[in-house]
Amino acid sequence: MELLKLLCLILFLTLSYVAFAIIVPPLNFPKNIPTIPFYVVFLPVIFPIDQTELYDLYIRESMEKYGAVKFFFGSRWNILVSRSEYLAQIFKDEDTFAKSGNQKKIPYSALAAYTGDNVISAYGAVWRNYRNAVTNGLQHFDDAPIFKNAKILCTLIKNRLLEGQTSIPMGPLSQRMALDNISQVALGFDFGALTHEKNAFHEHLIRIKKQIFHPFFLTFPFLDVLPIPSRKKAFKDVVSFRELLVKRVQDELVNNYKFEQTTFAASDLIRAHNNEIIDYKQLTDNIVIILVAGHENPQLLFNSSLYLLAKYSNEWQEKLRKEVNGITDPKGLADLPLLNAFLFEVVRMYPPLSTIINRCTTKTCKLGAEIVIPKGVYVGYNNFGTSHDPKTWGTTADDFKPERWGSDIETIRKNWRMAKNRCAVTGFHGGRRACLGEKLALTEMRISLAEMLKQFRWSLDPEWEEKLTPAGPLCPLNLKLKFNENIME
């Protein structure tokens, strides 16, 4: 009996401690910034609320007043930042605010098993090895596959129109195009998502993403250590997908020695592995992250671009169509003022990853003049909040206004660079760790949108509920568009 009472007491104390750790931030967290209630992160799972609405209702006021808040996510309390000067400090002082990805933050999770240790999440000498291996392939690439895939996408849309399908869900199609783009441009093989309607590789990836990005397990990743059948299957599927992906790269680049004559990012990774700069797991991790990040962010941007062109079809869709008509060389698209101002505004309005928490303090430090952060605390940034901050963007911060970037291409480029340097736009992050794929992603957007504009007019499906994603990547939720073709003048 006494033993039973003792066990009950231990269980009660344990549960009380866990509840306290979830409800209340650690006592050594800064007291001079607000705490966002722990339950806020769960609201999109319970109610039909998207992440921009969540930000406006529960985070915006505190974030805009203080520039930083305490925020519960991923089984822990974090410091979440949006003020530009704080972000500039974080990006500049990487030795204090060190990159710390899922492989360190939640190494026991299915998500960490999926992406591993890679060029996005690594730190120090290891990161430099990764960066040296992949930079050339991501910065200097052949854009011909992107042009070809944009035409294939348009053909698929036309086929659906011929079948009488006037309202078309764009998420699956844009994902298929983005997968083929990154695989052909950076990995040296054709994923085949556009040309094969039932692509086993693609279906495997979709299944994994549903398992890994389940909102509940993202919020409580420690549950992945429990013998839950669905999580055990998630780990098994992750291992299988990684093996299939690397085998495909081996078949296309290694076994035939093609990597020796090519400059794909994957080719450079293989050379780094052969020269013993990186090991086999690091090779696999970086091939996986190139595919994952290299298709997700362009897919999200493309969907947001299509959405905004549909929403403002009478103005911006018509303006851009007139500008791109007659442009036959894809490289000329980079010099079009309206197209580029539009794209930069899309990135500002809807950064593909609205919230990123992947920095960890290596020592007790001060953020700004007054916010003292203990050692070992995860610090993240709310990209949506930064690019919608009225202190930076004025009273039109929430308005879609591509003209804010300028009227000529030189001014537009200058303002884009300045906004990134001032950390006013962090969709591609900043500092030394700025996204290596920015050039590739924007090239994909220019070519794909130009081809769409030449071949179609489109509008929002009246039956589609105008809503953004509830959590995670930011874009229109299950976007549906109505198309008409034969619009070239």
From Swiss-Prot:
Q: Which GO terms describe its cellular component?
A: endoplasmic reticulum
Q: Name one GO biological process term.
A: ascospore wall assembly
Q: Which GO terms describe its molecular function?
A: heme binding; iron ion binding; monooxygenase activity; NADPH dehydrogenase activity; oxidoreductase activity, acting on paired donors, with incorporation or reduction of molecular oxygen
Q: Could you say which residues bind heme here?
A: 435
The cross-references to InterPro entries, in alphabetical order and at most eight, read: Cyt_P450, Cyt_P450_CS, Cyt_P450_E_grp-I, Cyt_P450_sf, Cytochrome_P450_monoxygenase
What EC number(s) are associated with this protein in UniProt?
A: 1.14.14.-
Q: Does the keyword RNA-binding apply?
A: no
Q: Which cysteines are joined by disulfide bonds?
A: none
Q: Give the enzyme class.
A: oxidoreductase
Q: Which superkingdom does the taxonomy of this entry point to?
A: Eukaryota
Cofactors demanded by this protein: heme
Classification via SUPFAM superfamilies: Cytochrome P450
Which keywords fit this entry according to its UniProt record?
Heme, Iron, Metal-binding, Monooxygenase, Oxidoreductase, Sporulation
Role, per record: Involved in spore wall maturation. Thought to catalyze the oxidation of tyrosine residues in the formation of LL-dityrosine a precursor of the spore wall.
What family is it from? Belongs to the cytochrome P450 family.
Q: What is this protein called?
A: Cytochrome P450-DIT2
Protein's gene: DIT2
